[in-house]
């Protein structure tokens, strides 16, 4: 044995200064003395022995399942077989290490699959850069490889570290790299674009201000900035990795360290406060058992998560946070465009019913649940956090801004501020056929909880006019008029806007023309039969009485004529009076009294409607009641039969006191539909079930209250 090699064999410090080829030569010499070889190699480090073993086999393996003694025996066996030439290389690779039989994934094409150190080259290493280079016997530098045995990537001359396996901040690599503790600059969405591909330790990123994850750094997004190129990259994947490991781990030290990392990552983001609250709760629960989290992997006596009192609860919170994070990753952008109000066929036809259900104008978005109702050409109603979807308990008030979509900035002053529970506001002064963007900011005290933006398109002026005319047609008066005089030629006229008042013939010409008038009147009489009146009573949405102005016009026009048109309201009279049991033939003085009574009733109705309008926006009292009853039927709290009877009674027979009681019930139980339905059924079931008798003859019918005839007129 050479003297220099003999001295190195006994001194481990000299051995560390030797090159790989010199170490291999020394091992070959030691293999000839089997009693001395094992003792000398035992003084060497495990990494030095593995380096020689990989060079001898031509393969890079970690041999984590073998002890140091077993590795030395394997190395000496391979060297002895090479010296004796007893077996071939292929057989040696397959037989010498039976434990390492697992197939490994192929490396990428742009990197060398295996690196074999040539016997004629001298390898020099550079510990600072983490790379090594091979120099041939002529002194010419050839190829530079990464010092990491698990990487061995080819490096360029200008590279100071391996971008594939080393940190771009500390320029070091991990022997057993954990990808969940590294951040990589990539082109993955939502931050697409050219990336450098460098990676760094997560701990190094926390200690560097350029990464945006410093102690005092806060950002609205969930990103970090590459220290090398400055590109923004998403942190969502890193969050999910930490939470997944924390949810599945069995070791307490791993759970503590991962939760510490998640909490540190979330503190740098102002956008995901809800997720941060869940993680903070998990950390507080865990700290009650293990103490404050220092951030470094720790060894604990009770190292199993299931042995901790709070272990299962903490991992459940991790699962909850992970589900919230998955929802965030799959949520579309915040700004969502509402469907245009013109797209609904119901709104194009403007076929509104008395219930005024505008489901097509309603849309929700975001956590605040913004809804638009009564979208017109110049105004609309904004509704936040409806009764079906109440607002979160920590929300105190909302501030609303609006602008046209082409405009970039919102006005400095907010459009309105809504405080819980009042979450409805009418916005007027809008331009027809214009798209507006509404921004709603929710607050908990002075703290901003969230921002939602939503677009809406107002109607055009033509659509607004068409809708107005359609609404007028839908509520056009359907008269039910009849005369109770002894004149047999008197007829009952019924139409939307016109009426027929036949006169007694005063001349021959009038006698000749009277049959044509009677024929036309007879045709119109066919429209109103007893069955029609019963059908009208069953479906209250298809019957509307004459309003006060039209009744005044009818009475003024018929004052000078013998037959008098009597409206349903004047026919029935005062609902509370027993004198209204029978129809009365009106005289001049009676008409004046009826006119005054109608004015008083109109004023009362306006007052009632005003009360409802205050609670229900632009809805009248009857419309508001019909809408509520219809909602109770759709939700299954009442049946169709009760709905028909109740609305017929409410619109035709209910007294002012009963209407007031119904209004109080609706306003009181509006948040509890089931209780409202039970109260209405219990209070008014008997009243709505009372049938009204129809009297009259020769095709003319009138609906009057049942009972004894107390007075008689002639």
UniProtKB/Swiss-Prot annotation:
User: Coordinates of motif Nuclear localization signal in the sequence?
Assistant: 239-246
Q: Which domain of life is it from?
A: Eukaryota
Quote one Gene Ontology molecular function term.
Answer: DNA binding
Q: Where is the composition biased (Polar residues)?
A: 478-498
Cellular localization per UniProt: Nucleus
| Up-regulation conditions | By cold (e.g. 4 degrees Celsius). Levels follow a diurnal regulation with an accumulation during the dark period and reduced levels upon exposure to light (at protein level).
Q: Tell me which Gene Ontology terms the entry assigns under biological process.
A: circadian regulation of gene expression; constitutive heterochromatin formation; flower development; regulation of short-day photoperiodism, flowering; response to cold; vegetative to reproductive phase transition of meristem; vernalization response
Ranges for the region named Disordered are 478-530
What CDD domains has UniProt attached to this entry?
FN3, PHD_VIN3_plant
Tell me which residues make up the Fibronectin type-III domain: 366-463
Gene knockout outcome: Delayed flowering in short days but not in long days conditions, associated with high expression of MAF5, a floral repressor, due to a reduced H3K9me2 status of MAF5 locus.
Q: Which UniProt keywords apply?
A: DNA-binding, Flowering, Metal-binding, Nucleus, Repressor, Stress response, Transcription, Transcription regulation, Zinc, Zinc-finger
Annotated region VIN3-Interacting Domain (VID): the residues are 602-714
InterPro entries in alphabetical order: FN3_dom (IPR003961), FN3_sf (IPR036116), Ig-like_fold (IPR013783), Oberon-like_PHD (IPR032881), VIN3-like (IPR044514), VIN3-like_C (IPR056990)
* Any GO CC annotation of this UniProt entry: plasmodesma
Q: Where are the zinc fingers (PHD-type)?
A: 164-232
What subunit structure does UniProt give? Self-interacts. Interacts with VIN3 and VIL1. Component of the plant homeodomain / polycomb repressive complex 2 (PHD-PRC2) large complex during prolonged cold, composed of core PRC2 components (VRN2, EZA1, FIE and MSI1), and three related PHD finger proteins (VIL1, VIL2 and VIN3) that mediates histone H3 trimethylation on 'Lys-27' (H3K27me3).
Main role? Maybe involved in both the vernalization and photoperiod pathways by regulating gene expression. Binds preferentially to dimethylated histone H3 'Lys-9' (H3K9me2). Promotes flowering in non-inductive photoperiods (e.g. short days) through the maintenance of the epigenetically repressed state of MAF5 via H3K9me2 and plant homeodomain / polycomb repressive complex 2 (PHD-PRC2)-dependent H3K27me3.
The entry's protein name is VIN3-like protein 2
- What species does this protein belong to? Arabidopsis thaliana (Mouse-ear cress)
Please spell out the taxonomic lineage of the organism that makes this protein: Eukaryota, Viridiplantae, Streptophyta, Embryophyta, Tracheophyta
């Amino acid at each position: 044995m050479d003297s220099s090699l003999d001295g190195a064999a006994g001194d481990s410090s000299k051995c560390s200064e030797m090159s790989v080829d010199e170490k291999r030569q020394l091992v070959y010499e030691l293999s000839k003395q089997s009693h001395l070889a094992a003792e000398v190699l035992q003084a060497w480090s495990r990494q030095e022995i593995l380096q020689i073993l990989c060079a001898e086999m031509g393969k890079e393996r970690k041999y984590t399942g073998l002890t140091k003694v077993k590795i030395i025996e394997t190395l000496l066996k391979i060297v002895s077989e090479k010296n004796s030439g007893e077996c071939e290389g292929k057989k040696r690779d397959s037989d010498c290490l039976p434990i390492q039989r697992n197939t490994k994934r192929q490396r990428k094409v742009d990197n060398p699959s295996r690196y074999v150190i040539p016997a004629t080259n001298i390898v020099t290493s550079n510990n600072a850069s983490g790379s090594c280079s091979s120099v041939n016997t002529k002194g010419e530098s050839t190829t530079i490889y990464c010092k990491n045995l698990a990487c061995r990537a080819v490096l360029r001359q200008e590279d100071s570290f391996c971008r594939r396996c080393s940190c771009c901040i500390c320029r070091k690599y991990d022997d057993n790299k954990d990808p969940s503790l590294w951040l990589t600059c990539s082109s993955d969405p939502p931050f697409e674009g050219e990336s450098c591909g460098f990676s760094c330790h997560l701990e190094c990123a926390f200690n560097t201000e350029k990464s945006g994850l410093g102690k005092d750094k806060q950002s609205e997004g969930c990103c970090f900035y590459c220290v090398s190129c400055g590109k923004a990259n998403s942190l969502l994947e890193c969050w999910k990795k930490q939470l997944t490991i924390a949810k599945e781990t069995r070791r307490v030290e791993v759970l503590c360290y991962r939760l510490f990392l998640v909490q540190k990552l979330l503190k740098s983001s102002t956008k995901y406060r809800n997720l941060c609250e869940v993680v903070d709760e998990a950390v507080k629960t865990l700290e009650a058992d293990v103490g404050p989290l220092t951030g470094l992997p720790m060894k604990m006596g009770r190292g199993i998560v299931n042995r901790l009192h709070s272990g299962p609860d903490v991992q459940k919170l991790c699962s909850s946070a992970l589900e919230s994070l998955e929802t965030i990753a799959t949520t579309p952008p915040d700004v969502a465009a509402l469907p245009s109000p013109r797209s609904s066929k119901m709104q194009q036809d403007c076929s509104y019913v008395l219930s005024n259900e505008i489901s097509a104008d309603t849309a929700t978005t975001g956590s605040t649940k913004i809804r638009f109702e009564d979208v017109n050409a110049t105004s609309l109603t904004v509704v936040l956090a409806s009764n079906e979807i109440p607002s979160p308990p920590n929300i105190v008030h909302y501030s609303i801004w609006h602008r046209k979509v082409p405009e970039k900035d919102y006005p400095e002053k907010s459009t309105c501020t809504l405080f819980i529970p009042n979450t409805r506001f009418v916005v007027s002064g809008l331009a027809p056929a214009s798209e507006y963007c509404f921004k709603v900011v929710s607050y908990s005290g002075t703290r901003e909880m969230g921002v939602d933006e939503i677009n809406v398109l107002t109607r055009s002026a033509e659509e607004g006019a068409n809708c107005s005319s359609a609404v007028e047609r839908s509520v056009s008066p359907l008269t039910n008029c009849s005369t109770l005089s002894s004149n047999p030629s008197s007829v009952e006229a019924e139409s939307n806007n016109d009426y027929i008042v036949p006169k007694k013939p005063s001349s021959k010409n009038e006698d000749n023309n009277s049959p044509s008038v009677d024929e036309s009147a007879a045709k119109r009489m066919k429209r109103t039969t007893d069955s029609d009146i019963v059908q009208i009573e069953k479906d209250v949405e298809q019957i509307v009485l004459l309003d006060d102005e039209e009744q005044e016009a009818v009475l003024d026009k018929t004052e000078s004529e013998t037959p008098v048109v009597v409206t349903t309201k004047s026919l029935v009279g005062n609902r509370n009076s027993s004198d209204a049991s029978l129809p009365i033939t009106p005289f001049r003085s009676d008409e004046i009294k009826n006119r005054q009574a109608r004015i008083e009733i109109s004023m009362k109705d306006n007052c009632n409607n005003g009360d409802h309008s205050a609670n229900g926006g632009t809805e009248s009292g009857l419309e508001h009641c019909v809408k509520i009853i219809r909602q109770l039927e759709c939700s299954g709290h009442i049946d169709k039969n009760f709905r028909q009877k109740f609305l017929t009674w409410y619109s035709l027979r209910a007294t002012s006191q009963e209407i007031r009681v119904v209004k109080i019930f609706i306003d009181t139980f509006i948040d509890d539909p089931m209780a409202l339905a039970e109260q209405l059924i219990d209070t008014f079931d008997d009243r709505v079930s009372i049938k009204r008798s129809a009297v009259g003859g020769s095709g003319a019918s009138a609906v009057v209250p049942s009972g004894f005839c107390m007075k008689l007129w002639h």
